[in-house]
Amino acid sequence: YYTTGTANVTFGGEKQITAALYKLTSGEAKVAYYTTNHGEQEPTATLTETLSAQNITLQPLDLLTSEIPEDCSLLIINAPTSDLASDDGLVDEVSMVQNYLNEGGRILLTTNAYDETPNLDALMAEFGLAREPGIVVEGDSSHALYGYPYSLFPDYGTTVETTALNGVNRSTHVMLSVAQGLTVTETEDVTAEALLNTSEEAYSKQNVNSAATTD
């Protein structure tokens, strides 16, 4: 909001992302499972309705009591606040997810900037992804909501190696609030690409109440 009036901001992020996911499933009837019991955020009504309209059903999945079903076309791990269990526990959730991915499974993973998840971080590292501590602050005012540097308007990635963003309306801004940065690197067997990028002026701040920053 501005002091001289108001401005409307359209958030089409979920529909843009689900449109890309729809391309991966070829429009056939599919089932997407979202994990539970790690403090994850439940899928929003917008996401559920959009996927349903594209013939994709959402189902909850507790990895502590169930294997990943064979009909799982997409596994969603949505901002867990507690870590996945590893091989030092009764159930090895990390290996379950790892095996699912190694067999060609697809995953949609969002992170929580405030909680430590070393097991999940180790799994991400195998695919060229590392979380940056803190939350992203945008230093370029054209890439953030006016007066709110934590509300980002990132640029779409070029996605040279994939077609994940083909057909996405790039003139529609995706707004991300209190987002966490990721370092993306290529590993021997995996090509990792950024779908959304901040400006060069953005940085991570670990303590939002201090002036300390991390480039």
Task: Please state what every model-predicted region is.
Residues 1-215:
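Short, surface-exposed patches at the edges or C-terminal ends of soluble domains, predominantly
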